[in-house]
Amino acid sequence: MNDYEDLMELTDKQLWDQLPKVEGELKSDFFYELSRRSFEKSDYKSALALAEQARDILLELKDLTSDAEILKIYRAIGMNANALGNHDLVISTLEKALVIAKRSNLDSPEDYSILVDAYDQKEEFQKAIELLEWQFEKYNQIDDDVECAGCLAQISFIFRKLDKQDIALPKLNLALDFAKKTENTNYILLIQTYVAEVLYELENYQECEDLLDKLINSYELLNIKKNLLDMKLLKLQIQWMSNSNEREIIESIKELSLQIIGDDQEAVDQRIRFEQTIINCMEHLGSWSYTRELETRKKRLADLEQLVEVTKE
């Protein structure tokens, strides 16, 4: 047996039975195939251990194996480490893979998105930005406008985390240029939503409100409820900053929050955002009339956040 496709025809039992009889790169292929099947069953611990055995065999072969083979194994290790939340292993493995890939001209940018996520989780923001910029250049070479816009948007998110909205905004404006090339209305609106958020963070309220009016109109026409509520909330926050009637704004936010539907993760996250905003506004006023409601809302917020933690587990 010398063709990997033949391995895919074997049962798990046949693979394990024949494993002691094979050696070299073929043995690595056996471990890789067993790892792949474990991954498909969401048994990531077993899949990772099997992929690491496949890697160890290939590394012992040194020059007797191809870069493509070792890259395949490194990606498998990275995917399983990512599924297990082991960001350090993702980084150490895929950094090695990227060096080999660039050297061998086998560098597919989509293979390293989980490395960006790992850098972000470990707060290695500069490395994440550099990798995203590299991905952007790769996608730009093949005129993949969707991915170009996505890379630029991700870069902007990182700069926002670093409180560098002045750098984030030009990145988003460029992302918007690429999004418009796709002629995908929903994608264009998504990037414009990010632009509105950054304009708000930069306290450019008039420009932000002008854009919000357009977004609210578009989301109403398309009946995209979640985004519509978020944009209406942002507009109310601008009105709050302009010293409008604060109690009326709180009541308007409360009314909007009742329109959130669904129990999925996005709906829960949206409820958390609304509850936190209402609590912040009430605490800002410091009125005794909100004392009991504040206690209730803080309890509700804690329950929602606990639900998110349970979901993550």
Language model region names:
Residues 25, 65-68, 106, 146, ...:
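Residue signature of alpha-solenoid helical repeat architecture, marking inter-repeat boundaries
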Residues 16, 55-62, 95-102, 133-144, ...:
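Amphipathic alpha-helical segments of tetratricopeptide repeats
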Residues 41, 77, 84, 122, ...:
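Structural motif corresponding to the intra-repeat A-B loop/turn of tetratricopeptide repeats
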